[in-house]
Structures are given as C-alpha cells and as structure tokens.
C-alpha cells in the first residue's frame, strides 16, 4: 500500500508589485537549444532552420544542452518570475524575446475535486484546468510556441487542419504577429469554433471529411503554394509548448509528480510533451526518477491508440468511421502514434476507450457535484478514471490528475425549457 501523499505547499510567486506583468516576455534569458532530432532514427538537424518532418517522415524533437540549463536555472529563480508559461524560458526554444507572440498564457490552476474523489473512494483527484488559457483551450500552449518560432524563422503563411480549438489558437496568434493563416476543419465542426477562427483573422474552410482529410489538403497546398504546414507534430515546436503542462504540474505539486495522469488523446502532443518534460526536469535535478503512469484516453468511436496498445504494436492503423461527441480526440490516425505508445508503455500506463454516454454522464456529474464545467474531451478522462477505478487498473490510494483541455463554454450545451409566467400566481413551494 502506498503512503498517502502529503499535500504540497503552494509554489510561491512574486508579489504583484515586485515585477512588471511582462517580465518574462521582455527579459533576455539564456537559451539552450542544441539541435533537432528525428524521433525515429535519431538523425540530427540544425535548430535554427525551418523544418517539418524528418527525412524519414517522422516528427522532429527539440533537444537542449541540459547541463547548461542545470547550471543556469534554479528552483529559487523560478519563484521570482511571473506565473506564466514563459517562466520556463531556459527549457523553451524561442531565443529572442522579440519573437515571443503572447496573449497572456498564465499558469493554469490545479483543482481538487473532493466530492468526486469521495464519491469514487479515490485518495486524491485533481484536475488541471486548461480552459483558462487564451482562446479557451490547451491548444494555446502548442500554437504560441509554433507561431513564435514561425515568426523567428520568417514564415509568412501558416496552414493547418483542425477539429476547432487548434485552429482558433493558430488564428489568434498568427493575427497577433501579422502572419497569414489558412485553416481547414471537418464539415461538422461546431459553428462557435468556425466563427471564432474566422473572427480572429484566419481564412477558414469546412471540408466534407475528417481531420486527416483536411490534413491532406494542407500537405497538398504546401507543395503547390508554399504555405507552412502547421499540422500536429509536422513541425517541432507544438510539443515544446505542450510540455509546459508537465513543467507546471511538477512545480504545482512541490516538484513531485502524481501517480497517474489521464490525458485526452487525439494527436497526442500533450502526452508526448509531458513525458519529455519529466525527463528534462530529472536531468536538471528538479525532480527524482519517479514517473507518473500515463493513461491515453480515447473515445470508443475513435480509439486507434487503444487498439494498437492492446495489440502490442508500435503503430496504429487508421480508425474508419470515426465518431464521438468529443471532437477534439476524433483523430483517426496520429503522426506521432509510436511516440504516444512509447510514453504509455515506458510509464507502465495504459490506453483506454470510453463510450459517449459515459462522457456525457461524467460531464454532468462534474458540473452538478463540483460546479466545474468540463469540455467533452476533459470529461472523457473522468469517465476513464471511473472505469479504471472499477476494474482495478487505477488503485484508490493513487493520486490522479485529469486534464480538462478546454472550457466547456466552447461546446454546445443542453437546452433549458423551464419558464415562469410573471402575470400568474407563483407557487414558490413548488420551485
């Protein structure tokens, strides 16, 4: 039996009057990128040039001089920095502050869910609420880094496929720095997402297909008109933005890691990025060797990673007829499938699929019991936790962290039909 975790002291941050709000965006700090590396072959590529996939057709990973980072960055130094994503500058790829494109990427809260924990008999259930980020989702982490690096490397036109939230983030950050953006989304993408993308300056098209069909259009356009393909894992810097979830989480837990992380998995950059973050934190002496078990959560209507994990293979076949209410994880085939599966297996975690009915029930329960409106993808992680506690894959004495990847306000909400006629007598006892 594991010992219960001692609740960590909250990380101290500077007083509001101790430094300017934009200190992390204007203070030049040393950067330590050494090179890029093919995730499959290990082939090295120069860091300060524009890249998509490696020659092997696989994602490129940013590597750092971690000995240099270890010398330059201390935990104590972090306590004197403003609480935003850019506080970890030594572990990020943007070299010049002038290239940072920011909309205020604040550290997102880690919220206890005591009622849900008690209901499930779980030791400690925490949710990292990524809906507090610009454009209302964790896609802001990846796209702020991708766009900042695109600006640094002279890109003038970016294109991408999206199920909604990533497109909104690209549109916002690209407009912020004057880069043109063209975005393609499936025909059934919610109107609120498409309108948000268009309002923030992108040219957006609905496509009669799924996100990978949209991706094919982006790839064809790259060859024909030369825009930069910003598809998930087809450029190196989304992962670097997403890994800040792991950096933040470890700091919020007093430089510890939880027992289990449940992560809504489509393209998987966040899961891959956090796994990278924990390795880098250990290398610079900020955490020990313990790792959380990484759980890739998918919808039963689109679960290529679950199928590949259970089959014991390294790559996932395309999932045909993909469908789920959690559109953000409706990704039939992921470029980084082998990296997702590698992280899950190395961590001794697992992949799990949940039905749409279970997602809806989890969303309703979190809102009703905790006053916390999750997005469907985030609710999928709570549904997966319930399922895993019931079947024993997660023990009740383990500390579990769920990721709510967007605000629930960006999604269609159920209608409310109750009305009251003010001109008639009101039976207040019946209200």
Predicted regions and their residues:
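Cationic, low-complexity basic patches in intrinsically disordered or flexible, solvent-exposed regions
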Residues: 4-7
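Short, low-complexity intrinsically disordered segments enriched in A/P/G/S/L with frequent Arg
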Residues: 11, 17-20, 25
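PLP-dependent amino-acid enzyme catalytic core
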Residues: 24-431
């Amino acid at each position: 039996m594991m010992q219960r975790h001692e609740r960590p002291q909250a990380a101290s941050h500077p007083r509001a009057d101790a430094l300017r709000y934009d200190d992390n965006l204007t203070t030049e700090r040393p950067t330590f990128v050494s090179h890029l590396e093919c995730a499959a072959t290990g082939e090295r590529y120069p860091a300060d040039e524009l890249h998509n996939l490696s020659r092997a057709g696989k994602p490129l990973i940013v590597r750092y001089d971690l000995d240099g980072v270890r010398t330059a960055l201390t935990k104590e130094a972090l306590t004197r920095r403003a609480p935003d994503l850019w506080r970890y500058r030594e572990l990020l790829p943007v070299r010049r502050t002038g290239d940072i494109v920011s909309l205020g990427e604040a550290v997102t809260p880690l919220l206890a869910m005591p009622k849900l924990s008690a209901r499930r008999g779980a030791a400690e259930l925490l949710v990292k609420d990524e809906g507090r980020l610009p454009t209302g989702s964790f896609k802001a982490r990846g796209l702020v880094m991708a766009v900042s690096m695109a600006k640094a490397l002279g890109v003038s036109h970016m294109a991408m496929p999206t199920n909604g939230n990533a497109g909104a983030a690209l549109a916002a950050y690209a407009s912020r720095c004057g880069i043109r953006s063209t975005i393609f989304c499936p025909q059934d993408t919610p109107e609120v997402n498409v309108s948000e993308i268009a309002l923030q300056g992108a040219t957006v098209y609905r496509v009669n297909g799924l996100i990978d069909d949209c991706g094919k259009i982006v790839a064809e356009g790259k060859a024909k008109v030369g825009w930069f393909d910003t598809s998930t894992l087809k450029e190196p810097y989304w992962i670097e933005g997403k890994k800040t979830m792991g950096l933040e989480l470890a700091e919020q837990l007093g430089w510890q890691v939880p027992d289990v992380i449940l992560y809504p998995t489509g393209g998987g950059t966040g899961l891959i990025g956090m796994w990278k973050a924990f390795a880098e934190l250990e290398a610079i002496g900020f955490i020990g060797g313990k790792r959380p078990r990484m759980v890739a959560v998918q919808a039963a209507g689109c679960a290529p990673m679950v199928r590949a994990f259970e089959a014991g293979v390294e790559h996932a076949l395309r999932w045909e007829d993909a469908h789920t209410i959690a559109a953000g994880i409706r990704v039939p085939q992921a470029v980084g499938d082998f990296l997702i599966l590698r992280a899950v297996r190395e961590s001794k975690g697992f992949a799990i699929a949940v039905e749409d009915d279970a997602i809806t029930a989890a969303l309703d329960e979190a809102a009703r019991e905790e006053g916390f409106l999750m997005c469907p993808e985030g609710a999928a992680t709570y549904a997966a936790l319930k399922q895993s506690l019931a079947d024993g894959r997660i023990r009740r004495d383990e500390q579990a962290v769920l990721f709510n990847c967007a605000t629930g306000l960006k999604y269609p909400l159920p209608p409310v039909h109750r009305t009251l006629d003010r001109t008639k007598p009101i039976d207040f006892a019946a209200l």
